[in-house]
Curated annotation (Swiss-Prot):
InterPro entries: IF5A-like (IPR001884), IF5A-like_N (IPR048670), NA-bd_OB-fold (IPR012340), Rib_uL2_dom2 (IPR014722), Trans_elong_IF5A_hypusine_site (IPR019769), Transl_elong_IF5A_arc (IPR022847), Transl_elong_IF5A_C (IPR020189), Translation_prot_SH3-like_sf (IPR008991). This is Translation initiation factor 5A. One of its GO terms (molecular function) is translation elongation factor activity. The modification Hypusine is found at residue 36. The keyword Cytoplasm applies. One of its GO terms (biological process) is positive regulation of translational termination. Belongs to the eIF-5A family. SUPFAM superfamilies: Nucleic acid-binding proteins, Translation proteins SH3-like domain. The keyword Protein biosynthesis applies. Pfam families: eIF-5a, IF5A-like_N. It is found in: Cytoplasm. One of its GO terms (cellular component) is cytoplasm. NCBIfam families: eIF_5A, PRK03999.1.
Length: 131
């Protein structure tokens, strides 16, 4: 998986950004023009996709930031062992283990043979929803 580049000024709520090496979803963007000769600054508040931790970024509007490439795929649950879920990709038929999602509404629906949507972001995988 990879990373694209964008400017801070193009970020808006709901977009994705990499802050401190962690892929995050932007929840709030505020822009402020500083004094007479200063460039505009943006304050971005984002939540980590994997940990749920809140992260902030303060940078000039014209500076470059990393945007993660999110690959959305479908898989089928093969087994559910404690805090790990074994999934088979429905296109490539490869099998792998993913950590059990922390969201209770998603975790409660995971059972054998259920179809799930998972995201692969920067080499890490996460179950997002159950069909």
């Amino acid at each position: 998986m990879g990373i694209n580049y964008s400017t801070v000024g193009e970020m808006k709520e709901g977009s994705y950004i990499v802050i401190d090496g962690e892929p995050c979803r932007v929840v709030e963007v505020t822009k402020a023009k500083t004094g007479k000769h200063g460039s505009a600054k943006a304050n971005i508040i984002a939540v980590s996709i994997f940990t749920g931790a809140k992260k902030t970024l303060m940078a000039p509007v014209d500076s470059t930031v990393e945007v993660p490439i999110i690959e959305k795929r479908m898989g089928q649950v093969i087994s559910n062992v404690g805090d790990k879920v074994q999934i088979m990709d429905l296109e490539t038929y490869e099998t792998f283990e993913i950590d059990m999602p922390t969201e209770e509404d998603v975790a409660s629906k995971i059972k054998k043979d259920a179809e799930v949507e998972y995201w692969e972001v920067m080499g890490r995988k996460k179950i997002v929803r159950v069909k």
